């Protein structure tokens, strides 16, 4: 189905509607699964030696020093323009402001007299950030990951990226307080972070996007007892736009294409109650496509994308919640009025001037978001992902005495005799003291 095909949602059967909201298939082939498993085992067994072999094989690079030196990072900084450095500084300031505001106050309550319960937070001790390489280095992801890690107080923050690492990535790492950067990419980088090597430290949790091999490596290490936790399940990027008749077609088209250019497996969807808006957006997409260097990539993504006309804005919200987009852009008059009805979305952008690019780079929200329908159960990345919660309880003699019979009754009902005995022993001790 062509992206220029305008679909009337209410003329479709329930099955056709379900098909319209299906995402491009993603599944690691058996060969990818096996290859990644072999890489993990090899890196775990042979450490740095295996990393160097994989760099030569996959990156066509001979890596002498896996760890990037301070001199190399300083030199990279010198090569960047002041304009880019200033732009990064503005982005980091906004990311800091938003993520600092996410700090949770400690919980300290007395659930009944003499029974004190607390909840406190502690940072994840060590985290590893994976940043893909390639022709368009994702240095903005360094800002999005390293900044909350620093605010959370993670003691060890390291970064891996395929060699040669772009100057922008090295500077962003330094700017955000990353302690060590390593010349290693792909599934082998995930293995190094999960298991540790002579050079790369083992970390508790791994963050960051990547290709099918990286994604599969993260999945596998998260399921190994000796592996590491990961940030969230990954899938192709996506955006859904809700637009009314007052939206600007060129704005809508530019936001759709911003997502489509990410990759051929990206998906974009327009929902609008105005058929004329759908037609004008389709025309604007074609005009803007002609000017894009990544037009072919975007065009492939558009093959799995949709222009859907609905009954009204309420139905747009209903369909959006069913789909659960990574990015949801609401270009309607009084866009904020629709927010209370949104139940599943990674990040929401309100109004004509809240373009997705702002969230991707510099508004302050995090651009690491659940995709592929995981918005139903997962949240956008935030400070909490770099922290863990811990509870504390303290019972006084009086508090224990008041709760003792309740605990005994519950333990006896579950036939956990040792649990009940732990109470009874203390009750008897108090009687003896009296």
UniProtKB/Swiss-Prot annotation:
Which GO cellular component terms, listed alphabetically, does the Swiss-Prot or TrEMBL entry include? Answer: cytosol
InterPro entries cross-referenced by the UniProt entry: Ald_DH/histidinol_DH (IPR016161), Histidinol_DH_CS (IPR001692), Histidinol_DH_monofunct (IPR022695), Hstdl_DH (IPR012131)
The UniProt record gives the binding positions of NAD(+) as 130, 188, 211
The protein's annotated catalytic reaction(s) are: L-histidinol + 2 NAD(+) + H2O = L-histidine + 2 NADH + 3 H(+)
Q: In which pathway does it act?
A: Amino-acid biosynthesis; L-histidine biosynthesis; L-histidine from 5-phospho-alpha-D-ribose 1-diphosphate: step 9/9
The catalytic activity of this protein is classed by the Enzyme Commission as 1.1.1.23
Which residues carry out catalysis?
326-327
User: For this UniProt entry, which residues form the secretion signal?
Assistant: none
**Per its Swiss-Prot or TrEMBL entry, what cofactor is needed?**
Zn(2+)
SUPFAM superfamilies with a match to the protein in the record: ALDH-like
Query: Is Lyase among this UniProt entry's keywords?
Result: no
Is the keyword Zinc in the record?
yes
Q: Which residues bind Zn(2+)?
A: 259, 262, 360, 419
Give the top-level enzyme category.
Answer: oxidoreductase
A single GO molecular-function term is: NAD binding
Enumerate the residues binding substrate.
237, 259, 262, 327, 360, 414, 419
Task: Name the domain of life this protein comes from.
Answer: Bacteria
Cofactor info, note text: Binds 1 zinc ion per subunit.
Q: Name one GO biological process term.
A: L-histidine biosynthetic process
Alphabetically sorted, this entry's keywords are: Amino-acid biosynthesis, Histidine biosynthesis, Metal-binding, NAD, Oxidoreductase, Zinc
Q: Which HAMAP family match?
A: HisD
Task: Give the similarity note.
Answer: Belongs to the histidinol dehydrogenase family.
Biological function: Catalyzes the sequential NAD-dependent oxidations of L-histidinol to L-histidinaldehyde and then to L-histidine.
Subunit structure as annotated in this protein's UniProt entry: Homodimer.
**What's the protein name?**
Histidinol dehydrogenase
- Which gene name does the record give? hisD
């Amino acid at each position: 189905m062509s992206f220029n095909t305008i679909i009337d949602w209410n003329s479709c059967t329930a099955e056709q509607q379900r098909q319209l909201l299906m995402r491009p298939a993603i599944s690691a082939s058996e060969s990818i699964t096996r290859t990644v498993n072999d890489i993990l085992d090899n890196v775990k067994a042979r450490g740095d030696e295996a990393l160097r072999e994989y760099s030569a094989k996959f990156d066509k690079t001979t890596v002498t020093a896996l760890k990037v030196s301070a001199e190399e990072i300083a030199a990279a900084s010198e090569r960047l323009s002041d304009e880019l450095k200033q732009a990064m500084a503005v982005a980091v300031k906004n990311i800091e402001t938003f993520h600092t505001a996410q700090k949770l106050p400690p919980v300290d309550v007395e659930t009944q007299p003499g029974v004190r319960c607390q909840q406190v937070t502690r940072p994840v001790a060590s985290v590893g950030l994976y940043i893909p390489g390639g022709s368009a280095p994702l240095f903005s992801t360094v800002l999005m990951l390293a900044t909350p890690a620093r605010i959370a107080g993670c003691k060890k923050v390291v970064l891996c990226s395929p060699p040669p690492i772009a100057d922008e990535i090295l500077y962003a790492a330094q700017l955000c307080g990353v302690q060590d950067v390593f010349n290693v990419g792909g599934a082998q980088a995930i293995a190094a972070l999960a298991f540790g090597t002579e050079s790369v430290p083992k970390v508790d949790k791994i963050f960051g996007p990547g290709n099918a091999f990286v994604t599969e490596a993260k999945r596998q290490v998260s399921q190994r007892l000796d592996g590491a936790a990961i940030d969230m399940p990954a899938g192709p990027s996506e955006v859904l736009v809700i637009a009314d008749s007052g939206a600007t077609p060129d704005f809508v088209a530019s936001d759709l294409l911003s997502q489509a250019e990410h990759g051929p497996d990206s998906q974009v969807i327009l929902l609008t109650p105005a058929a004329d808006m759908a037609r004008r957006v389709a025309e604007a997409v074609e005009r803007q496509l002609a000017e894009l260097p990544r037009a072919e990539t975007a065009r492939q993504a558009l093959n799995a994308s949709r222009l859907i006309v609905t009954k009204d804005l309420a139905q747009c919200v209903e369909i959006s919640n069913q789909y659960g987009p990574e990015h949801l852009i609401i270009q309607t008059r009084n866009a904020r009025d629709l927010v209370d009805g949104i139940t599943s979305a990674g990040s929401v952008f309100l109004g004509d001037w809240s373009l997705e690019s702002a969230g991707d780079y510099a508004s302050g929200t995090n651009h690491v978001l659940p995709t592929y329908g995981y918005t139903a159960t997962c949240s956008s990345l935030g400070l909490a992902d770099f922290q863990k919660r811990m509870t504390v309880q303290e019972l006084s003699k009086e508090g224990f005495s008041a709760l003792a019979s309740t605990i005994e009754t519950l333990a006896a009902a579950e036939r956990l005799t040792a649990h009940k005995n732990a109470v009874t022993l203390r009750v008897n001790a108090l009687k003896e003291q009296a």
